[in-house]
């Protein structure tokens, strides 16, 4: 009993306010009090009022709210509700919401302290947890876009998504406006150049968007250089393929007269400076047919050497795997005629485009993040500390992935229109790539060690990924230590165990065979797993997303398709190169989509900078503050390093890393 001060915060996005009336109740350990009709929430506003409660409530557990309407349901986006009392000396309790309130049902918001099942011995929150998860499992159902692929949220369109997973209006308007602009520019360029005959590589300037990326302009000017070709395996938009050679690849057969090359490769191998990029995953993938014209896919192997100055230079390129009973395929060398060597590198870059966009970016970034998001919503109630830790890193992931499945990789989507693996090959590639989703490959300390990239001073991706992983790991450990005092408390958390199992066994289709845990047996194992989840949704995605505009804007550096088969001889002319690279329309659409998806997003939340406060109490806030301080220190270190580099690496710079897979 006594006077309570109540504050209610409404979101700032368009349509966040409501004309409907909201009714509130306070629920404590010893009683419940109705506060009456008190407010019509206004967008971006915080409403405060005081109310005298006659009942003795004890410690507050919930705020219940109900929105009532007479004519139409006007959804309300509630940020949080704060209650202080009884009296001026009473405690303040924060009740996080950060969701849409629709209909006229009663919504219960638990106080913001993170609590596991073990933390609730009296069962004060037991019913709420069970009812919330039961409702969530109806809303968040597993779906299967294509047989053989990891699972996704059920639903074919954005309207099938739970409302809380959809873009807020400001994000939706920006995304759709950029798409409209890109398609309009594409239509204009198509109409102006429909009869244009492409004769030289400089003709690609006609569809190149100057002023969008300084780095892209440098790529256009330097893309033919071997040093830049090798650099992209270390620090480009797909740093996930390169590995240090421990033996010469079995597929590397030497045609007659290649003894000197073999000796050079053996020498680099013995010195530990031989690296390889193997695209065997593309072997046998069905190539697209675009407007009745056959396209082509290759499965190259690139052998590279790391020089003392840190440059990674190509030594040989094999464009296709050898076949039993046939002569070894040709090996293309830097000493070949310039056009021959350039075309071989273009084939590698086109193959890298396919593996990057489908395997490294879509599958390992977007789709795995979606598995984490769906499992989190199905298994962890909003009061659970791991839900509170993870939820800022899952924002918008389900909608952006549905947009990808209905626009990019759908039937008649962008891949079918202009990409050589479209028309079904892209689905086959995703199915194959699932076998390579190993747990260790999602954890940079393990992945970089496995690929032999630790200690490579010119691999700025490796350096920044390790730093970011360590910072995330300390952040996760800080939160975990507040809520799990022993390994036994981890093992006894049935919600946590169900979440882990849902990710590994259900969403990832039995990934325990690939090293993913089915149960979490210790605090250390929990920290490692949660760090992996957050890194996947932040740094891992950003490292394969942010570079698209820089490296794919100049189409010859990353051709979306190839219109002639890979060369089998070395008599290559400029005419053959131009006939192989994408035509005008294909190149224009690649440029348009690259701009839309690769541009710096005007509406984004940088890593760790989310405004939502899901935790109550000073301890979690102190952990988050420390996390932000460490991110700021990393930001400064990267800034200082990049100032000394000819080609700055920024794709893991914390201010550019998005807090979730949202684009």
Swiss-Prot record:
Pfam families: Lipoxygenase (PF00305), PLAT (PF01477). The keyword Oxidoreductase applies. Residues 116-663 form the Lipoxygenase domain. Fe cation binds at residues 361, 366, 541, 545, 663. One of its GO terms (cellular component) is cytosol. Residues 2-115 form the PLAT domain. One of its GO terms (biological process) is response to endoplasmic reticulum stress. It comes from the Eukaryota. One of its GO terms (molecular function) is arachidonate 15-lipoxygenase activity. Non-heme iron-containing dioxygenase that catalyzes the stereo-specific peroxidation of free and esterified polyunsaturated fatty acids generating a spectrum of bioactive lipid mediators. It inserts peroxyl groups at C12 or C15 of arachidonate ((5Z,8Z,11Z,14Z)-eicosatetraenoate) producing both 12-hydroperoxyeicosatetraenoate/12-HPETE and 15-hydroperoxyeicosatetraenoate/15-HPETE. It may then act on 12-HPETE to produce hepoxilins, which may show pro-inflammatory properties. Can also peroxidize linoleate ((9Z,12Z)-octadecadienoate) to 13-hydroperoxyoctadecadienoate. The PLAT domain can bind calcium ions; this promotes association with membranes. Belongs to the lipoxygenase family. This is Polyunsaturated fatty acid lipoxygenase ALOX15.
